[in-house]
């Protein structure tokens, strides 16, 4: 079986916004699932994260990748009008899965997430949301697909405490939730566990999420400075010079 370091190294030329720490979290969560489990990824882009999930998951784990590759919400500041690039992303996605040796393991649904609910009939053990970052679609993905996660299952959300839309979706859906407990994050990838929870657990979850708001505010400052081409100022404040993920 492949190990994490070799898989991550092999993805060096695969485009995407997943850091090493985030890839490790995906690897660990997928790798702990037993045969018969179901994993759904919303927002696959060129396959960087799905290659990690599928390489780590045990035989018998079912994996779905949902992405319309339609040219909207393609990436940072690429909200619409990228149909030609998206078709290229679609082809590259399939090629990257094949190159990683996991193409046959992944059921690819070229659809918007809200149109794919009937294609996945089982409950979910792991849900990874990295789709559109605006509030409405982000909250729809988390609400609609999060309801399919089993008690004890995990939800991972990319661009948490980084994107305004995604963070607002978390405020509405997870901060005060009786179902979702915040367990931590790898940069902007937040992890939640689903299940009935005590009041004490819910209060602790809320407190931990509130504690991430200074990180969120700093990310917004970085984004403004980078958009204004003020990288030196952003770096002086601690930015690596890259868009914060």
Region locations from a protein language model:
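S-adenosylmethionine/decaboxylated-SAM
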Residues: 2-20, 24-245
